[in-house]
């Protein structure tokens, strides 16, 4: 039964209506909304007011757009919105919302529309989550559940990608973010998703069946159903046919009680504990380990002892032998930690944490990882591990440098092979031409606009598909060849005007953009021939330079000319995208084109630098040759030399000597260095300057025109391996290794150099090898000596660590003597009976049981006399202590009575003081009431007088009218009587009003007086309750003290048992060694004075008499006489 059973009913609820948020468009007061009436058009002017609204779109030339908002007249709520493109958005519609330009659309359901404070229309939405928005943990749980139910095989990848997750998250966005409507269908089960729509088509249809709670990050079903059926029932195992009695007993019996007598069992456990305590006492280990192992002497030892006794067949001798052997193994454990090891372990824990493998490898190699782990649980309870840490230093938050802009890490690495273009409008594309851009997904060159999405530049169709569905669309007829504009040209070896030396001291040469396209950073494909490996779009050629792998700089060549010159004519239109990219051969063309615009008289100068190196650290880079291209004037070179021109003169600068060989002239410009003085060869640059001049024209012209048309190498061009020596130096020979049919190309590709036999370089190499051999031989000798020394040290340590037979015998003798002494002490103290001692004595201790028995009997007879004297002394001491206890109790009772009397007197004083304060307070209240009454009477009298005066001064309007008539004419008797009657009525009314006012004042005063009396009564009740509680507490304390005193008296009155007296005497003797020595001396003197008798009974009697006298004297010295003690009165 699932957890949704209690929430289910007989009728399923339409969860689609529940999950989609409800809004105020529902009908009110039972009247249906006009939107639901089919007889009238939707949003008719009969029920709705149409209001225009204006908003702006980003990235458009016509930013201001005009839309329409529909307001319902009955409740003045916004029910719909029509955008500038004619899309009508209603409540509960599912829409696409653009939150970010580079991310997919957010799918949400419309809850309502409203105006902001600035009269901008915004839409309230309830968001759906995609699978990429759900946490990985929740998504994995869902996938695991579906895999168990075998749901995934029923769906295709497109269907799973269209799945959404409903939520209750409310968001608000402006209407300018709406990007169209979609359909979100609810399905009860994911297996029914196919019935909703065909998700392989771009029909803007999605489905959902689960609800996502953002607070708990959990996915739950939106459709509650009772899970009944075979799929949801547990598989019950078959009923067991055998009974419990048939099953074999798997418990192991460790001990069977009542197998031996209880006394023997207790003695056996005492002996085992004594053996282990003695064994651990002589061990040298850390306190933490000793404390941990001493726990095994307590209850754990008892368990181990009885288990071993059961395994030995309840033979006490065999069990003790096994336990003793285990104790010896326990003390000789090799994993004990020394103080230095403990310090290293604590240092490793603080620095490396609980990485016990590293601690074992770096700090404690002689301790295994298991030993370190077990020691850690002991170490962490020590004070060193539990001491508080130092307070961390506070860091000023203002000093921390924070990034000015947060960088969001992409979910997947973005390919660096594609170009990054800014957002562009349709007009920008037209200006750039059709070859300016291409889609990174479908390789299309035509699009309405270009925008970034998922880190790629996409066309309109690919971008909208990605924004809607969160994935790139499938391309049926995708071109197999990547467009040229999607590649970024790599820098080639020929791009730099000079090659870096091994030391890296050459400055980076000036680079110019390529003439194939206007964007120098764009990539173009290139195919490599003549034996060079083919490189794909994602591969980049690398080379090894100075021992490290670096990116090989490469740039294209045009017409066999190194692109070292800026483009002269920038107004030429680029090649169309339909033109195939030029085919390059080994980074160079044929060396000459059909239209050669290079005039005669150009000068080309190259410097060749030969750097011999004899460092011990780098053997592979001996005698490197690098060629430095001159960067004074950018000169085009065809295959290393101009084919049409002749080499007139080559200047070779080498070792300061001037030679002339085959047109090569040397001049002394480079200093020499002595090899014998420094044992090294200086870097001697050999500068080869090739100057090519034309006799007809000596002027140079660097204005070149780069043509877009590049011809590939001729298929007839061939090359072969050669061995001709081009020229020689003092220490090297330059050999042309590649002979091309089209002529020489470049010295870096066609020439190699070899070390000349008998030269300085060869000698230095041989000397270097000899030095290496000598160094290696010396190092081997030193290593062998170190190994021999280490082996000798190990042998010495092993010899020192192994004890000699004399030492072993001496240690065993000491251990036997100590153990025998302990057993003798135990026998003398009377802890072990003679029969048990004879049975339990281990065979390795050579002690005569008869002698031990005699000693025990004599000690027992002597102890009887000592016990009698001690009992008499203890009786006297008990009486004195009883008197002292009674006196102390009497004094304590008197002191307690005195304290109680003082407390009662203080309480009486406090009660009298409170009574006086209450009487004074009541008197002040009565005085205050009397004053109030007097003031009230005075005020009433004054008020009456004022009323009378006012009545006398103010006449009734009727009387005023009557007096005016009487002034005009003579007054009659009736008028006078009437006037008098009116005056009497007025006076009577005033008297009644004064009486009513007086009654009200009296009633108010009476209520105030009653309230004060009630407050005083409550105060008296609280005081009485406090006094009663204090009395109860005092009585309880007195009763407790009396009970405690009685218990103490009863405890002191109890007499000491003989065993307690015996133990007390032994304690006194052990605490006072001087008394023990005196007792032994007295016994020796008594034995010397007594006559020699052969009867052992007489010897025992004499010994007992002397021992009793000595014990009496000793007790007198230990306890002073009663007369000497101070008497308490």
Swiss-Prot record:
> What happens without the gene?
Shortened lifespan and reduced survival in response to heat stress. Impaired differentiation of the Y rectal cell to the PDA neuron with the Y cell remaining undifferentiated in its original rectal location. Double RNAi-mediated knockdown with lin-40 results in delayed cell cycle progression in mesodermal and endodermal embryonic lineages, but accelerated cell cycle progression in a subset of embryonic lineages.
Expression by tissue, per the entry, reads:
Expression detected in anterior intestine and head region.
- Cellular component terms, GO, for this chain's entry? nucleus; NuRD complex
Main location per the UniProt record? nucleus
Alphabetically list the UniProt keywords.
Developmental protein, DNA-binding, Metal-binding, Nucleus, Repressor, Transcription, Transcription regulation, Zinc, Zinc-finger
Q: List residue spans of GATA-type Zn fingers.
A: 439-485
Q: Give the compositionally biased regions (Polar residues).
A: 1-11, 525-545, 561-573
SMART domains in the cross-refs = BAH, ELM2, SANT, ZnF_GATA
The answer to keyword Repressor applying to this record is yes
Provide the residue span(s) of the region labelled Disordered: 1-43, 388-434, 488-636, 693-717, 790-814, 899-950, 982-1040
Function according to Swiss-Prot or TrEMBL: Transcription factor which promotes stress survival and delays aging. Required for cell cycle progression and development of the mesodermal and endodermal embryonic lineages. Required for normal T-cell polarity, for correct migration of QL neuroblast descendants and other cells, for embryonic patterning and for the embryonic expression of hlh-8. Also required for the transdifferentiation of the Y rectal epithelial cell to the PDA motor neuron during larval development.
Q: What is this protein called?
A: Egg-laying defective protein 27
Q: Write down the species.
A: Caenorhabditis elegans
Q: Which gene encodes it?
A: egl-27
